[in-house]
A protein has these predicted regions:
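Non-ligating segments of multi-cofactor redox enzymes
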Residues: 1-210
Length: 210
């Protein structure tokens, strides 16, 4: 699955054995995220990004990951649509993601830039891959706590209204065009190299009325 995913610019971001409470069947759930560098250049040339229909990234993810699941005789699940799937809980259980000091999810490879495009349930209970270290344990400066220019996102709280108010102003242009400064501040994600165009795409969906 990892090799097949790499061919479509996805990579394994974690894996876990399912529990009865998951109610998705028994087996190994493999979480998939964007493979960098090159993910955005790849998906932005797909039919979903040129047909003018809404939600191109979700539609690309659904098409591509469903094919991967079929090829592996597995089942695809997604962090969008219904029923809602607990991707954050699954990520935490994988041992490769944790809650950061600002309470956003942090990943051992992608840092605060972590995102999941989907998951594939394999029917066998496979040996799980090694997990990475919790990046925040060795992060002394913790720049994420002070990176937000208006203090909307701190270890104490996330003031969503203050965040949106800032993004409405001219000063918020850098966040809208390059992505959240808190996410960018995380040293764990500096080698992940997500391009600004992808961050801008997500910001436009987070804050569509500017």
């Amino acid at each position: 699955l990892a090799r097949k995913a790499q061919a479509v610019h996805l990579e394994v971001f974690g894996a876990l054995h399912t529990l009865p409470a998951d109610d998705i069947g028994d087996g190994t759930l493999v979480l998939l995220g964007p493979a960098e560098p090159g993910f955005w250049a790849h998906v932005s040339e797909s039919p979903e990004f040129t047909d003018g229909a809404p939600d191109p990234l979700d539609r690309w993810s659904a098409r591509v990951i469903s094919v991967l699941a079929d090829e592996m005789d597995g089942t695809a699940f997604f962090p969008f649509g219904t029923p809602l799937r607990p991707f954050m809980s699954w990520a935490l259980r994988s041992g490769r993601a944790w809650s950061s000091p600002v309470r956003l999810l942090i990943h051992d490879h992608a840092g605060l830039m972590v995102s999941f495009r989907g998951a594939v349930l394999l029917r066998d209970r496979l040996t799980l891959p090694p997990t990475g270290p919790f990046p925040c344990e060795t992060c002394i400066e913790r720049p994420c706590l002070t990176a937000c220019p208006v203090g909307a996102l701190t270890g104490a709280d996330y003031d969503l209204d203050r965040c949106h108010d800032f993004l409405d102003r001219a000063q918020g242009t850098i966040c809208m065009s390059q992505g959240c400064t808190v996410r960018h501040s995380c040293p764990a994600g500096h080698k992940y190299r997500r391009v600004n165009a992808q961050s801008a795409f997500h910001m436009e969906r987070f804050h569509p009325c500017r």
